[in-house]
From Swiss-Prot:
This is U6-lycotoxin-Ls1d. Keywords: Disulfide bond, Secreted, Signal, Toxin. Residues 22-25 form a propeptide. GO terms for cellular component: extracellular region. Belongs to the neurotoxin 19 (CSTX) family. 06 (U6-Lctx) subfamily. Residues 1-21 form the signal peptide. It comes from Lycosa singoriensis. It is found in: Secreted. Contains 4 disulfide bonds. Pfam families: Toxin_35 (PF10530). Expressed by the venom gland.
Amino acid sequence: MKLLLFTALVLVVISLVEVEAENERACIPLEKECTKTPGNCCSGLKCDCYRRFEQGVAKGIQCWCIEKDVTYKGV
């Protein structure tokens, strides 16, 4: 009985460690593209999107993980 409980506990711990490691790998770091997965920026970051133009023609939307409290302005 003790062996069964110990084995179950070990399996639960291993599962939790694997899930946590998977979640850490899933986040997108600072200044990396998040167009397809806007909710996956790492902690403290937000996905900010911009419409891209080339010679006045819209070429799509691109999104990047940036710091939450930072505002960027064009020069």
